Regions:
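Short beta-strand elements
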Residues: 388-407
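Glycoside hydrolase catalytic-domain context in secreted enzymes
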Residues: 1-388, 408-850, 854-916
């Protein structure tokens, strides 16, 4: 069957997500929407360099074009002051954008053009309104910092905003950021309008301009609380203070749960807040309390003069009981359709009462390790943010009710003190209590839960598709696999494995010839979450970031967008997108907050479920990550997140639980670090007890790439696959070669370190996942095809496969036939026998003048090795060299040519004796 991916609809849907995710914090002096008949002045170099996403694996999507905000304004008919624009263009050319030093080394911001006050005054004579754009980035292995140019405004930005404010009648500030930033100087300078336009992917400028010009009224809501200072956040005292450990002393009181309970005065903008060009009247028309649910009918009327959408948010105030609760907790939300002035819509929201229960990790209610609906009054509030939501209804719970009876799992092994509310004359103060520690023997628990071994039969000719078609059982299929086969199937191969789509993150499943012989296909994973990362240079669609998607509060639009994403994946033979990222915004300095949704687990889970449902419509899926408590990038491979079991279950695991139970998640990635002393890659409680036994997860799990694994009390080891597999974490990502690897699986099988039945269970999980993939359909010869229409010719990719070259210690590639025309790329891949630091020598010539600057940039696995800038050589061959680490067997390279006039001769790779 052929399916259609309409690229124009894809672009339009992404731009719509941008416009619905933008959050307008203020709009004084009727600064917005813009009058397109009047000229505007645009300040800030980010007008040319829109941040489509943050950095690292979540942002490395190759695109043909990013629509920046300036493009969007001009395309929407806005008149932009040409003199100011030309001045910026000239300065930007003389002061190139700083790409930084590659992976984890990109600057958080760029230097700004110093403003001549005379120019500002001159442009202000013809322009009533100025737009100032400030940009930020951060990402993988790069947290934000509490310093100028990162979380704080830089001196240049303060000076720019100040002089513009002094000279313009109306000032609009756009924050092109992946994460909230400090608002102190912004509040002091007081622009008329302030909008978080986030990072909107390749269509970000279009969606932003649609809002600025009034084509779309802003309807985004804050997925995080904006406090006055970074130190106001409850996690601040325990974020990054220790090299290898963060203690989650704030417990369940994360974000608005803390502020609304203990510190309302520290909030600048509350969770869920966001303005529109119009106004809405919200009334709870009906509240029905049943045994299992609270059903609310809420009328929303547009009483303003612009069309627009509104988000209805429902919060619950539970009785404090013996456990202690947050003052308000989000328990439902819906977004209206677009309402014209005076139009009204009734929104129906149902709240599952059982999901209002709190987890008792201490036994204080008499129900240890249970979710308990404590006795007392449960009040519900309805509105458009957590602070302004008004009382709607309540019900009385007569006695404690256990809604779910579980067992202690993943509890800390060391006690610490956590926050607990103390009620004093109608207000709460912060008390403390000791956190319960684990009483579980993890090794004994694992042995108690060993599956039954399947007797080995050898090859009976059963193929995996025979299981799919009901001809044989999965047990009969798994019985054929030898010990060696079982050791291979738990290896992911990559990055850039030739078994799957070029430039992707990994192959899994059929990673050996023997496994292929059983009809096990090689499934394909690609980073993720903001679109496909294809390191061979293939162009893909860059999506709005997770924070922007959460800000839309629009589940239906999210599913629609990710159906397009799924079709694009299918067209590129990708089975798993490594996303959505689901970690909680515990602190605003976390560098990967842009990938994640929110400080709230309910919103996180609902939006992730919407993404998964969308991808499922195309026969593909996402890998929910990072499981769990991955809330800091600094020293992420060794960090220990020390968290109470209650906080884990109610905050840091809850979003994952919703994604599994409501979104049908079938692929999960663990973290690099530890939770309560044990690396998550080998944590049995996490991967088996909670994920599979409690939540009913049916699918496969994987480690993060080159993750550490350990046994309680022992040092981490990247080769301890036995510890990973017996935890029921199924695949180690990644190995250079699926058929041979320096791991301990077979040795552990011989000495009793792992049981054969456990490896069979891993194999069944992996094969069970592959049963439902396009990869298996292709192996059967019945795969669907996806036809892409309305994609411009220059965006189409060459179908020629990437060529692999085997390398022992050195190789020289003749590149004299490569097209070096400006804007083109050339990709190739190396199959390495030896890993280490390689010297890269590029030889080229040019007949241009000696002053000519002809740059070409070399990328390794999507990360810049460096730019080789040649001058005119009089036609003589000249060599330039750099060094790059290569520690993956399959390494994909891409050369990008930024200027005409270079005659490329060769590229040589030589292994050096340098250590990493």
């Amino acid at each position: 069957m052929e399916r259609i991916l309409d690229w124009n609809k894809y672009l339009d849907t992404a731009a719509k997500m941008v416009s619905e995710g933008i959050v307008m914090l203020k709009n004084d002096n009727n600064a917005l929407p813009l009058d397109i008949d009047k000229e505007v002045a645009v300040f800030g170099r980010i007008q040319f360099h829109y941040y489509k996403s943050g950095t690292g694996s979540g942002g490395m999507v190759n695109v043909t074009k990013v629509v920046n905000i300036l493009d969007g304004l001009i395309d929407n008919g806005v008149k932009v002051n040409e003199k100011l624009l030309d001045t910026y263009r000239k300065w930007d050319k003389e002061n190139p954008f700083d790409l930084g030093e590659g992976w984890g080394g990109e600057p958080w911001s760029q230097k700004e053009m110093p403003l001549d006050e005379g120019l500002v005054k001159e442009t202000a004579k013809s322009c009533e309104t100025a737009i100032v754009i400030i940009g930020r980035t951060a990402g993988e292995e790069q947290d934000n910092r509490l310093e100028a140019g990162s979380y704080l405004l830089s001196d240049d930005e303060i000076a720019m905003l100040t002089v513009v404010r002094e000279n313009y009648k109306k000032v609009v500030l756009l924050l092109n950021v992946g994460n909230i930033i400090d608002m102190t100087d912004i509040n002091r300078i007081a622009p008329d309008s302030v909008l978080y336009v986030w990072q909107g992917g390749m269509t970000g400028g279009k969606g932003t301009a649609d809002v600025l010009t009034g084509k779309v009224s802003p309807s985004g809501k804050l997925p995080d609380t904006i406090a006055y200072k970074a130190s106001d956040y409850p996690s601040d005292a325990n974020f990054g203070r220790e090299k290898n450990r963060d203690i989650y002393a704030e417990d369940i009181y994360v974000g608005y749960r803390y502020f609304e309970t203990f510190a309302k005065e520290k909030v600048l903008y509350p969770f869920g807040f966001g303005l529109s060009y119009t106004e809405f009247e919200i009334k709870t028309e009906k509240a029905e309390i049943t045994e299992g649910a609270v059903k609310l009918s809420v009328s929303v009327k547009n009483i303003g003069s612009y069309k627009g959408k509104e988000v209805i948010e429902v919060y619950c105030e539970a009785p404090q009981g013996r456990l202690g609760k947050a003052a308000r907790v989000l328990c439902g939300f819906e977004k209206t359709r677009e309402l014209v002035p005076q139009e009204e819509q009734v929104v129906e929201i149902a709240v599952d009462i059982a999901k209002l229960a709190s987890y008792d990790d201490s036994g204080v209610t008499g129900n240890k390790s249970c979710y308990v609906l404590e006795a007392g009054e449960y009040k519900f509030y309805v509105g458009s943010d957590v602070r302004s939501a008004e009382y709607a209804c309540s019900f009385e719970q007569g006695e404690d009710l256990v809604t779910e009876r579980l067992t202690q799992s993943l509890a800390p092994v060391e006690s610490f003190e956590r926050i607990k509310p103390v009620c004093e004359v109608g207000a709460f103060s912060i008390g403390r209590e000791a956190v319960p520690v684990s009483e579980v023997d993890e090794s004994a628990r694992r042995l108690e839960k060993l599956p039954k071994e399947i007797a080995y039969t050898g090859d009976k000719g059963i193929k995996l598709w025979d299981v799919k078609n009901g001809k044989n059982t999965m047990d009969e299929f798994i019985a054929q696999l030898s010990d060696y086969d079982l050791s291979c199937i738990i290896r992911g191969e990559g990055m850039g494995s030739p078994r799957v789509t070029a430039g992707t993150a990994s192959a899994f499943g059929g990673v050996s010839e023997n496994l292929n012989g059983f009809g096990i296909p090689a499934g394909c994973c690609s980073d993720g979450p903001s679109g496909m990362r294809l390191d061979c240079g293939t162009k893909a669609f860059s999506l709005p970031n997770g924070t922007m998607i959460a800000s839309s509060f629009n589940k239906e639009l999210t599913s629609e967008l990710f159906t397009f994403m799924g079709l694009e994946m299918a067209a590129n033979k990708v089975d798993c997108l490594l996303g959505p990222g689901m970690n909680i915004h515990r602190h605003p300095l976390n560098g990967r907050n842009f990938e994640y949704f929110s400080e709230d687990p309910f919103l996180t889970g609902k939006m992730a479920a919407a993404e998964l449902k969308g991808m499922a419509g195309a026969g593909v899926t996402g890998t929910i990550k990072h499981f769990c408590a991955n809330n800091r990038e600094t020293n992420r491979h060794f960090i220990d997140s020390v968290v109470s079991e209650r906080a884990l279950r109610e905050i840091y695991l809850k979003g994952f639980e919703i994604a599994v139970k409501e979104g049908g998640a079938s692929s999960v990635m663990t973290t690099y670090g530890r939770v309560n002393g044990l690396w998550t890659a080998g944590n049995f409680d996490l991967n088996t007890v909670i994920l599979r036994e409690e939540w009913g997860f049916k699918g496969f799990t994987m480690t993060d790439w080159w993750a550490n694994i350990n046994v309680r009390g022992k040092e981490p080891d990247k080769t301890d696959f036995a510890a990973m597999a017996r935890a029921q974490n199924d695949v180690y990502m990644v190995c250079p070669d699926g058929e041979k690897n320096d791991d301990n699986t077979l040795v552990a099988l011989e000495n009793g370190g792992i049981e054969r039945c456990e490896l069979q269970r891993n194999a069944a999980n992996i094969c069970g996942f592959l049963l439902h993939t396009n990869a298996l359909k292709r192996a059967e010869g019945i795969g669907d095809t996806v036809k892409v229409i309305n994609r411009e010719d220059e965006e189409q990719e060459d179908d020629k496969p990437v060529q692999f070259y085997k390398v022992d210690r050195d190789i020289t590639l003749d590149l004299s036939d490569v097209d070096t025309k400006k804007g083109t790329s050339y990709s190739f891949a190396l199959d390495l026998s030896n890993f280490g630091i390689y010297r890269v020598i590029v030889t080229a010539s040019s007949t241009q003048s000696e002053l000519a600057q002809i740059p070409m940039t070399l990328f390794s696995m999507g990360t810049a090795v460096g730019t080789f800038t040649f001058n005119g050589t009089g036609g003589k061959a000249v060599s330039m060299e750099k060094e790059t680490p290569m520690f993956s067997r399959f390494t994909t390279f891409r050369i990008y040519f930024a200027q005409n006039g270079l005659d490329l001769h060769s590229i040589r790779f030589e292994l050096t004796d340098k250590e990493r």
